[in-house]
Amino acid sequence: MTKQALDATIADMAGPFLASLGLELWGIELSYGGRTVVRLFVDGPEGVTIDQCAEVSRHVGLALEVEDVISSAYVLEVSSPGLERPFFRAEQMSPYVGRQIELTLIDPTPEWPGRRKFRGELLAVEGDTVVLRPEGAPAPEAEEAVLRTSWQGVRKANLIHVFPEPGHKPRR
């Protein structure tokens, strides 16, 4: 089964149960190595509790076993996406425009030769295109200071949590 097919199967199995708890599936990570690890990231309007993660783990784990979705031994991990949440779809980034993110591309772009990893301010999400002002870029108003990339060209994207200066209120 391909990663996309496995992701879709797990999402279909977990979705209704998560909805009944007022949660949503933020994303799925699969890692293969010495052992297979299936990571489910779940979130809700008020976040997610440890008890909810445990309940989701029991329910989804049982469903995966009954349906024999993964034929080899695996470990199921369920957690919140956290402060430095990974992004699994471009539209997940929209609420974080203006915040700092880290972006790793599959291949370098012609505008930024030899460079695949970027940190900087998320300027916009336009459909499937992510617009970022990388750290160390030329003058902010210059067009070459902006990285525009299709989500299909992104290997990994994470929010960077910036802790507030002592005595200042955190950004929301």
UniProtKB/Swiss-Prot annotation:
Q: Which GO terms describe its biological process?
A: ribosomal small subunit assembly; translation
Per UniProt, subcellular location reads as:
Cytoplasm
Keywords from UniProt, A to Z, are: Cytoplasm, Ribosome biogenesis
Give me the Gene Ontology terms describing cellular component: cytosol
Report any Pfam family annotated for this entry.
RimP_N
Q: Does the keyword Ligase apply?
A: no
Tell me the superkingdom of the source: Bacteria
Q: What is its main location?
A: cytoplasm
> Do you know which Gene3D superfamilies this protein is assigned to?
RimP-like superfamily, N-terminal
Quote the function comment for this protein. Required for maturation of 30S ribosomal subunits.
> What family is it from?
Belongs to the RimP family.
NCBIfam families xref list: PRK14632.1 (NF011225)
Q: What is this protein called?
A: Ribosome maturation factor RimP
Organism annotation = Nitratidesulfovibrio vulgaris (strain ATCC 29579 / DSM 644 / CCUG 34227 / NCIMB 8303 / VKM B-1760 / Hildenborough)
Q: Could you tell me the gene encoding this protein?
A: rimP
